[in-house]
UniProtKB/Swiss-Prot annotation:
CDD domains: ABC_PotA_N
GO cellular component: ATP-binding cassette (ABC) transporter complex
Organism encoding this protein: Clostridium acetobutylicum (strain ATCC 824 / DSM 792 / JCM 1419 / IAM 19013 / LMG 5710 / NBRC 13948 / NRRL B-527 / VKM B-1787 / 2291 / W)
Keywords annotated in UniProt: ATP-binding, Cell membrane, Membrane, Nucleotide-binding, Translocase, Transport
Keyword 4Fe-4S on entry: no
UniProt xrefs under PROSITE patterns: ABC_TRANSPORTER_1 (PS00211), ABC_TRANSPORTER_2 (PS50893), POTA (PS51305)
Upper taxonomic lineage: Bacteria, Bacillati, Bacillota, Clostridia, Eubacteriales
ABC transporter domain location: 7-237
PANTHER family per UniProt: SPERMIDINE/PUTRESCINE IMPORT ATP-BINDING PROTEIN POTA, SPERMIDINE_PUTRESCINE IMPORT ATP-BINDING PROTEIN POTA
Membrane topology: Peripheral membrane protein
Residues that hold ATP according to the record: 39-46
Record keyword Cell membrane present: yes
Protein name: Spermidine/putrescine import ATP-binding protein PotA
Endpoints of the signal sequence: none
Leading EC class: translocase
Length: 352
């Protein structure tokens, strides 16, 4: 194992009865990395997290932590802690005692416990809350206590199972940035589980997209968003226009009965492909100047942009633009070569 790799999953599978929840999973996580498992309900992301934590055992394959298999190592003997969506705080203990709990189990000196707890409460911006009851805290404050309690034991890996799911939208956005900031300050590896694409794109160094127990794509947020590997990823990560196309030859693709310049190479001549164009990458121009033109069938204001639907021949295009257009207007559409993404058609189960 390379020095910067903390944990590696090799051919890991998990079955419930005859059904695979995770099948032949291969990936590694680097030290100090923020990695996110992203996918719909039932994709296997929480099961994978539970196998890493030790709450579940793989039926096949190996989980390697710092060069040693931990398949049968019990959870309390792994240098791994977990924060759950339901924070599982001890309501009969105040904030200080909740955070100190793991250190007391280790029977550390009281002076050391106090120093470590104070350091963690300062890190999560809860200094002065030591004597507060956990029941008196807001959801965001309870979240911080749970994170401090998990981190005070100095794990090498922190697992977070949809910990922001119970928070309101504003607080969730704040906590996304705060979690990333904590991870960077401490230099600890985080593995985060979510079905929320925005959370994954905002916080992660690496995203693992899962569907029905198999990896669809592993990459940076930019790679996952801009260069989806298949139709499932393109549909799951944000809004996309996905069309049937034909790759005529390198740098030329045909869709919607028009030929476009693109930047893709390596396809067979006249190969059937899927074409992905993000709504924000479509330019609205005059009907005469557009490569495509059509009629506006809806225009809804979304706050930062209008979501516009345009009927072009037999295709309904979705466009995000700050320009106001009216239903019934005839407009032109233009797409730059860099904004056309070509994917090979794959025989995969793409339904979430």
């Amino acid at each position: 194992m390379e020095k910067d790799i903390l944990i590696e999953l090799k051919n890991v599978s998990k079955k419930y009865g005859e059904n695979y929840v995770i099948k032949n999973l291969n990936l590694f996580v680097r030290r100090n990395e923020f990695l996110t498992f992203l996918g719909p309900s039932g994709c296997g992301k929480t099961t994978t997290l539970n196998m890493i934590a030790g709450f579940e055992t793989p039926d096949e394959g190996n989980i390697i932590f710092e060069d040693s298999s931990i398949n049968i190592v019990p959870p309390h003997k792994r240098q791994i802690n977990t924060v759950f969506q339901k924070y599982a705080l001890f309501s009969h203990m105040n904030v200080y005692e909740n955070v100190a709990f793991g250190l007391r189990i280790k029977k550390l000196p009281e002076k050391q416990i106090r120093e470590e707890v104070e350091k963690m409460l300062s890190l999560v911006d809860l200094k002065g809350f030591e004597k507060r009851s956990t029941d008196s805290l807001s959801g965001g404050q309870q979240q911080r206590v749970a994170i401090a309690r998990a981190l005070v034991n100095k794990p090498k890996l922190l697992l977070l199972d949809e910990p922001l799911g119970a928070l309101d939208l504003k607080l969730r956005k704040e906590m996304q940035l705060e979690l990333k900031n904590i991870q960077q300050k401490l230099g600890i590896t985080f593995i985060f589980v979510t079905h929320d694409q925005e959370e994954a794109l905002t916080m992660s160094d690496t995203i693992v997209v899962l569907n029905k127990g198999t990896v669809q794509q592993i990459g940076t947020p930019e790679d996952i968003y801009n260069e989806p590997k298949n139709k499932f990823v393109a549909n799951f990560i944000g809004v996309s226009n996905i069309l049937n196309g034909v790759m005529l030859h390198d740098y030329k693709v045909k869709f919607d009965d028009e030929t476009f310049d693109c930047v893709d190479t390596g396809f067979n001549e006249n190969e059937d492909v899927d074409v992905v164009v993000r709504p924000e990458d479509i330019k609205i121009v005059s009907k005469e100047n557009g490569k495509l033109f059509g009629k506006v069938i809806s225009a809804v204001f979304r706050g930062v942009h209008y979501e516009i639907k345009v009927e072009v021949k037999n295709t309904t295009w979705i466009i995000h633009n700050t320009k106001h257009v009216r239903v019934g207007d005839s407009i032109g559409l233009d797409i730059l070569p860099d904004d056309i993404h070509i994917m090979r058609k794959e025989k995969i189960d793409e339904e979430a």
